[in-house]
Amino acid sequence: MGIDGETVVLKNMLIGVNLILLGSMLKPSECRLEVTTERAQRQTVEEEGGASSYNTSSKEQPMVFNHVYNINVPLESLCSSGLEASAEQDMSAEDDTLAEYIGQTSDHESQVTFTHKINLPKKACPCASSSQVLQELLSRIEMLEREVSLLRDQCNTNCCQESAATGQLDYVPHCSGHGNFSFESCGCICNEGWFGKNCSEPYCPLGCSSRGVCVDGQCICDSEYSGDDCSELRCPTDCSSRGLCVDGECVCEEPYTGEDCRELRCPGDCSGKGQCANGTCLCQEGYAGEDCSQRRCLNACSGRGHCQEGLCICEEGYQGPDCSAVAPPEDLRVAGISDRSIELEWDGPMAVTEYVISYQPTALGGLQLQQRVPGDWSGVTIMELEPGLTYNISVYAVISNILSLPITAKVATHLSTPQGLQFKTITETTVEVQWEPFSFSFDGWEISFIPKNNEGGVIAQLPSDVTSFNQTGLKPGEEYIVNVVALKEQARSPPTSASVSTVIDGPTQILVRDVSDTVAFVEWTPPRAKVDFILLKYGLVGGEGGKTTFRLQPPLSQYSVQALRPGSRYEVSISAVRGTNESEASSTQFTTEIDAPKNLRVGSRTATSLDLEWDNSEAEAQEYKVVYSTLAGEQYHEVLVPKGIGPTTKTTLTDLVPGTEYGVGISAVMNSKQSIPATMNARTELDSPRDLMVTASSETSISLIWTKASGPIDHYRITFTPSSGISSEVTVPRDRTSYTLTDLEPGAEYIISITAERGRQQSLESTVDAFTGFRPISHLHFSHVTSSSVNITWSDPSPPADRLILNYSPRDKEEDMLEVLLDATKRHAVLMGLQPATEYIVNLVAVHGTVTSEPIVGSITTGIDPPKNITISNVTKDSLTVSWSSPVAPFDYYRVSYRPTQVGRLDSSVVPNTVTEFAITRLYPATEYEISLNSVRGREESERICTLVHTAMDSPMDLIATNITPTEALLQWKAPMGEVENYVIVLTHFAIAGETILVDGVSEEFQLVDLLPSTHYTVTMYATSGPLMSGTIATNFSTLLDPPDNLTASEVTRQSALISWQPPRAAIENYVLTYKSTDGSRKELIVDAEDTWIRLEGLSENTDYTVLLQAAQEATRSSLTSTVFTTGGRVFSHPQDCAQHLMNGDTLSGVYTIFLNGELSHKLQVYCDMTTDGGGWIVFQRRQNGQTDFFRKWADYRVGFGNLEDEFWLGLDNIHRITAQGRYELRVDMRDGQEAVFAYYDKFAVEDSRSLYKIRIGSYNGTAGDSLSYHQGRPFSTEDRDNDVAVTNCAMSYKGAWWYKNCHRTNLNGKYGESRHSQGINWYHWKGHEFSIPFVEMKMRPYIHRLTAGRKRRALKF
């Protein structure tokens, strides 16, 4: 800023100071100074008249401040002045009444122009020119102008020459009067507290006292402070312009008061008998007037009386200090009491409009009810009370809807007579009684059983929660009178009675003893009751043959049951009968003994055996036990004999002692039980003498020898009969074993027999033929002639020879004769080592001592010899070659015969005698053949020589591999014709040693498993049968490339899924993954071989996807493996409740659409609570602000009303349809500010409209208390459909709709915010009947949701 700028500033400051001084000298009553400031921007200020203009060369437009100073004189002196003249007005115009002085200063650097205009009145009135003050002011202004002019001249001579100014300039103080000007520096040296080039900028005083901010030297104070230096406290709202602020406190003007002077002061400060409220007195009771100085009656006697010296004289029917209370009735008395009603009477004034009778049980939780009667009544009967309860009864008088104080009484109803007495079960000694429970509280029950004859009886007392009782210890068949009485304190209800007769008892302790095969003895204990007869029934278990029944007289306690079937299971039952009543039967089972076999007999006998036979038992015996021993009983023997087919069974006892008597016992055996034995004695035959032989004979005698009989005998009896027929006998002592018969006929043939005898018992005979005199061997017999042997037999000589000599030799070769010495007892001989096809001469002589008989001569020709050294060669599956050596004897040809050893025909072929081998063809493979060979000459055939041979096995055929997979292949082949025991399969791959597999011979296929994927295999195979092995067949195959395994979709969201798998065993190049959706979209991806998972992104929501994956190796691809998943976790496509929405992933509470029973045609919008106790709740009622009217008619409650996002009722029809889907649970949430409780019921259902939407709830849990169970099973009621059991219409009385009873303990559809008794939203066990709950939500959820959501059933946490 140049010197001109400083001058301008100084000038402005001087002018301002002088004007302030001028204002201070003028008194308020004389003159007034008005200052107006105008701010404008302009490019130039033109000079007009005597005004000067300053042309700025700044690039920016200057800022112009116009200051107008109006100096006014008092109105009383008729001084006037023109105000706020514009600096742009034409200053040359004549104005005789106004003297103006205009000055203008400009600052080049800041481009700020100050214009000052001072208006002084001149001719308005005589005071304008004569005022001494004004003259002094004008003089000071002129002096200031001169000082400014002088200062400018001084600056123009040195450093301030660049500054130029035009116009009317006056004196401006040096450095704004706040410093000294230095010509050396051509600048100001400011005093303390000032700064700037001309010292015009002040520092803020005291730094604003740290209570404000300094801006351009001025303090901008904090809100609590004021003053130049912010050191003064500010008064509240600046005392509302109605007082002075002194040290931050207001000193208020009249008639104001208060810390900010905003309140009006009350007259006389309400005389100390009231409170001041904004200038108005609120008087205390008993005082009135503007300043509460006047006494008055309370509430002006409420208009129901007149005031007299501050006291109210009330009209009839009213009372109280202000006559506001209605006088209560008097002399309340009880005229009658029953179990359900109380009759009351009272006295009251005639002015009463009506009476209100309030009654409530004294027990905790009792519901308070009311009844209204006209004012001219003096009594009432309260109905539908609960029996056995004590009631607090209050009677109010009502005049003009005002209730009096009550007159009260405490009255107890009588106990009700128990109802529904019935007998549940009746036995001989017990009776179970059942009756209906009471719905009210009482102490207990008393039940008595009194016999009809009044002899004795039983009395029992039971708890009140018991409604059934089982009385034991009664007499059977007795009639009892049963009484049930309710007890409470000292009171007893009238009894309910019924008669009952116990069942007659039957016989007990039934016992069956002395059971045989056909008889059983039954015993029992007789019944205690008097009966007409005893009924005994018995029959086979299972009902076969029906039952046999006997009627027995009561004294009997035993009976013999006969004609039973042996070995059978019987059931016997015994009961008692009186009139038409039959007791419960006592029964038991028993099994008859097995009957012994009958008619035991001996069929035939020998010396060592007995043939036994007997008739079978009637019982179904499986076998018979035969026990036998000699009568001496030295040793017993047992034999089990199966039951024979037919009526009898036979067995043979062997290895017995001859001639011995045996004791035999036979028992029938059935199911490890046996009958008593049937016994008999039987004797074996005597043992016969054996080996009876003739040792010598003469013309008249025959000597005999025999083997001694083994059993005990008395003697032997020898009978000998000649051919003439006259027999003779002789007795021989038992110790003899030889005897000679004498005096026989010479030359006669005798038949000799010998027997052993013991008493009258005789053994079988042994017989021999003998001759007296000499009988030579007559001829030789030849048999079994072969090529090298012959069998020779002959007859006995007589007398017997000492030895025999047999000679034989080929005919014409007597020199080769051979001799054979034979024992005299021999009757045959076999000659061996003979030559084939040779005639032999055979002679036999008997030697008797020294005498040799004439030889007996015979001849025999041996047969031709067979071929020798048979061998088999060149064996194939259907042919072989037979070789042999030629026989010695001449022959015509060979006969070769062959056939399978098992089954098959015999085939023969003739081979010339010159051939020694033969090829047999057309044989069966792997078959054992018997091959025989003999030589034939004429009709004579040699012996056959045989051998066995197996043909070779034929190979299985057409071996192929089918059904090839990565790890399996099915081998199939055609079986060979021959029998196969096993197949041998050898499986090889690459250079690995083969794996040998043995397969059963009946199979024609085999499943190869556990193969390596993508591997080339070679299979060789042959068949075996015993030692035989077929030829080998082979095939090749390659397993397929195995697919990836265990393809799984996890981490499925609404738009992505993680696909993972296990790699295949084979080496691969990559994977080909394809996924497609149900809408037809399809995408294929190539995945690296080392990857085992991929995340699919950008999927569609709520869409079913199929993922296909296969491995690839060059051009080969594996089979597909697949999996499916559904995005969005949509478990239920059409959720039928909020729980299913929650399981679908919908976790935000709000409005959702459900589909009843999952059907698209039955959709319903509901509000879902997804957070409370696990979420999934359907909210069907909400009360929260009272914006929705719940006092509605039946039709509204059926269909529902309100806003699901605010207050609403879902509708009874909808609630019924939802709960009909399954079992639901109920939760009621209630809040009062920060206090929250809930009630939970594990079952909830609302029936249909035909049942009037009855409510059904289950067991309670929670923190609110159980108030809803009182309404269990109640139909719904509205103002136009009264379905409760109360005298009044509960819905109408309590302005709601609910499942009322008589009337309610919860009224969640009541009037919002209404705290009158029972009128609001009540839950009795939480807030009682006189509090309206601000927030209520009723909600339901499927009971099974806790399980299906994967959570264990847990106890509710409070």
UniProtKB/Swiss-Prot annotation:
Pfam families: EGF_TEN, EGF_Teneurin, Fibrinogen_C, fn3. It comes from the Eukaryota. SUPFAM superfamilies: Fibrinogen C-terminal domain-like, Fibronectin type III. One of its GO terms (biological process) is negative regulation of axon extension involved in regeneration. Residues 1-31 form the signal peptide. Residues 188-199, 219-230, 250-261, 281-292, 312-323 form the EGF-like domain. Residues 127-157 form a coiled coil. Transmembrane segments: none annotated. Knockout mice display alterations of the extracellular matrix, and decreased axonal conduction velocities in the CNS. This is Tenascin-R. The lineage of its organism: Eukaryota, Metazoa, Chordata, Craniata, Vertebrata.
